[in-house]
Amino acid sequence: MFAVHLVAFYFTKLKEDQIKKVDRFLYHMRLSDETLVDIMARFQAEMEKGLGKDTNPTASVKMLPTFVRAIPDGSENGEFLSLDLGGSKFRVLKVQVSQEGQQNVQMESQFYPMPNEITRGNGTELFDYVADCLADFMKTKNLTHKKLPLGFTFSFPCRQNKLEEGVLLSWTKKFKARGVQDTDVVNRLATAMKKHKDLDVDILALVNDTVGTMMTCAYDDPNCEVGVIIGTGTNACYMEDMSNIDLVEGDEGRMCINTEWGAFGDDGALEDIRTEFDRELDLGSLNPGKQLFEKMISGLYMGELVRLILLKMAKVGLLFGGAKSSALHTKGKIETQHVAAMEMSKEGLANTREILVDLGLEPSESDCIAVQHVCTIVSFRSANLCAAALATILTRLRENKKLARLRTTVGMDGTLYKTHPQYPKRLHKVVRRLVPNCDVRFLLSESGSTKGAAMVTAVASRVQAQRKQIDKVLALFQLTREQLLGVRDKMRAELEYGLKKKTHSLATVKMLPTYVYGMPDGTEKGKFLALDLGGTNFRVLLVKIRRRSVRMYNKIFAIPLEIMQGTGEELFDHIVQCIADFLDYMGLKGAQLPLGFTFSFPCRQTCIDKGTLVGWTKGFKATDCEGEDVVDMLREAIKRRNEFDLDIVAIVNDTVGTMMTCGYEDPRCEIGLIAGTGSNVCYMEEMRNIELVDGDEGRMCVNTEWGGFGDNGCIDDIRTQYDKEVDEGSLNAGKQRYEKMTSGMYLGEIVRRILIDLTRQGLLFRGQISERLRTRGIFETKFLSQIESDRLALLQVRRILQQLGLDSTCEDSIVVKEVCGAVSRRAAQMCGAGMAAIVEKRREDQGLQHFKVTVGVDGTLYKLHPHFSRILQETVKELAPQCDVTFMLSEDGSGKGAALITAVAKRLQQPRKDI
């Protein structure tokens, strides 16, 4: 028993001694965590350099855009061919992707040899050989009668400008075919395939093997957004935000970047890490000074590194008693498969002895232990370096997504990773140690990168087909110049109908006289109350007017839905309650003040303090109001309360209030526009044109109520099925059709209807219509403004959609943003066409060649939407080129305008209370 313990002790001591000896000799190959963190920082800097337009030419890590913008979503379908060129064998594959209720992939493949005379010969011969193999495969599988899309996995660095193109930057591994560098390899393959008349193949995608690996794994796990190869060579790809890729135009979405990390260090960034053995190996390689990171990691070089170390250790007498065999002197005699065999847990030492004996050496027990440890240090360093670079990519993904913790999947492939017994667990352990805030799943690509090329092709086919369907829907909202001119001219005709006595009753644009005859002259003064009713909020203001200065105090009150859609008496009692609260709040209880009432609904007026409601809009439905004088209803509610008395001087529309507010600042202002919850315009019209009011002298403000434009069907040619659905689901079906295409209250609902349709077609949200998406009104217009903001990254768009209960992918977010853009752009253009009709009419009425005018504008859509105001202004400029139109934002809203109109009325003190 004692003897057994003695032998065990001796062996353990021997092992420890040998390990220490090797550790001392290979001290520089053992990398601490501190060193790995430093390497991460260097790799991050190189990635940034590669992504920058100005710095890319000198970057060693090329960060090549692949033009792969989407990963599989499970809806891919069809038959695809795939070629895989990049290793010692060449593979042709047929992939059948079908849904049938579940994801299903069937593959048939054939391997063909890649002789050295082909890989290092003439480029034309190389591609002819590939085309011959493809033709043979198609003939064998009876596919020559079919036209099939093809994905080409090409495992060498290429610069791409599109998915189906790739210019070879340089050969790597053992390839050296002449005349291929700086040429488009897809074009070279297509030319070679043309020599086979029976081949009808469409090359849809060129992908790197890492991209293929990522796509293969992403088909099984949608969280996969990184691909890593650790085999003959080494490389990684990952999904990068487009906003960070300077080399490609556009900021939307993500694109897969082929890092080509094998060249990391080619600029000297890793000189302090490289050892004498790395330098010796590099000098004896096919491409000295190139792919230095790869030469410290990949399977092509690992065995050779071990051989060089063993040779040196033998030379200095640390191994084999100083003996060296001719095999140990021979390049390539130790391969990576030998390293893997020597590091096996149980058979490792026996394998080591056998391999060393085959090399003509006579190893002792201690030699075998030492050699095994050399292999461990070399392969562990490889795993450490890979882990540092991968950890950098994972950190970048986490930071791009602005997450405290990232959950992601890395697709893995490569013979070294797959066949080395210790490599995967070492890599995983170090990665998790370097990025503790990332939960990483490592997924082995069972079918290799060739299936991935087919998946890229399948995704490209799907995206192409989906793009056509999406474009078809969006095209409905793209108005041509001719269509916009048509809207302008029809609006002009409707304006005329509304002004004329004979046609007024049939006109959709009501052109209501407001009895506002003039603008402030700056002499107005006093204290005035103003009410502003027109949306879900109601505002009460105290306005103090002094010579050329206005001070305002206001309070906002909510109008609950049950009040908006209850009885008229309840609505006006609620308004009076709000006035009472405000007077109390301002310490004016019992004060008798002149009041201006901004009432943003169509009213027929016979004088300035009388307004008969024509019809509710914007979601209001209070009963017993339509056809009634709303000023009388307000007076009666004040009487019912019996707490205070107010002198109601004027009732004005919000557009009139806006025009007056801006007119106080700019005498040229004679048009008011509201583009908010609702949409409307007023303007100063010549009295001679207003047939509903007696008198031809001077001008009067006309409230167009243009929201009703199109109620007679005159713009049905540009109304879409979605507009019709929104109209049918509204409180006032068949009414306010123009407003329903242009105002904030309805744009979100149009977007929601489009999203439902696209989802139904399987183009969004994985074809799943959530309960939330079925809910009317979830898509408020403020979300459109947020989603379309140029400053907002897609990640933030996704967050907005998630707040709405919509679980969207990056691709979904792009489509949602496009839909929002199409709907709001059309709204702005139609508003612009309507405005062009008004300014052109004013120009012609005054007989002017050139007309200069200011439009006072208010409304949340105009103020908050990032593009609405610009598009509206551009449209007016294009459709009314002889008019110089300035748009002035009404900072203080239409409430101030009501007070100004009241002030003007009091100043003039006309018994009729006309202005």
UniProtKB/Swiss-Prot annotation:
Region called Hexokinase small subdomain 2, residue ranges: 521-652
Name of a matching Pfam family: Hexokinase_2
Compartment list: Cytoplasm; Mitochondrion membrane; Photoreceptor inner segment
GO cellular component: mitochondrial membrane; mitochondrion; photoreceptor inner segment
Keyword Membrane tagged: yes
Reaction(s) the record says it catalyses: a D-hexose + ATP = a D-hexose 6-phosphate + ADP + H(+); D-glucose + ATP = D-glucose 6-phosphate + ADP + H(+)
GO molecular function: ATP binding; D-glucose binding; glucokinase activity
Amino-acid positions noted as binding ATP 2 in the UniProt annotation, renumbered to this chain: 532-537, 677, 744-745, 781-785, 860-864
Residues bound to D-glucose 6-phosphate 2: 532-536, 654, 677, 858-860, 894
Binding residues annotated for D-glucose 2, in chain numbering: 600-601, 617-618, 653-654, 679-680, 705, 739
GO biological process, one term: intracellular glucose homeostasis
Stretches the record annotates as Mitochondrial-binding peptide (MBP): 1-20
Positions contributing to ATP 1 binding: 30, 84-89, 425-426
UniProt pathway: Carbohydrate metabolism; hexose metabolism; Carbohydrate degradation; glycolysis; D-glyceraldehyde 3-phosphate and glycerone phosphate from D-glucose: step 1/4
Residue intervals of the Hexokinase domain: 16-458, 464-903
Family listed: Belongs to the hexokinase family.
PANTHER family registered for this protein in UniProt: HEXOKINASE (PTHR19443), HEXOKINASE HKDC1 (PTHR19443:SF28)
Cited function: Catalyzes the phosphorylation of hexose to hexose 6-phosphate, although at very low level compared to other hexokinases. Has low glucose phosphorylating activity compared to other hexokinases. Involved in glucose homeostasis and hepatic lipid accumulation. Required to maintain whole-body glucose homeostasis during pregnancy; however additional evidences are required to confirm this role.
Identification of the protein by name: Hexokinase HKDC1
Organism the protein comes from: Mus musculus (Mouse)
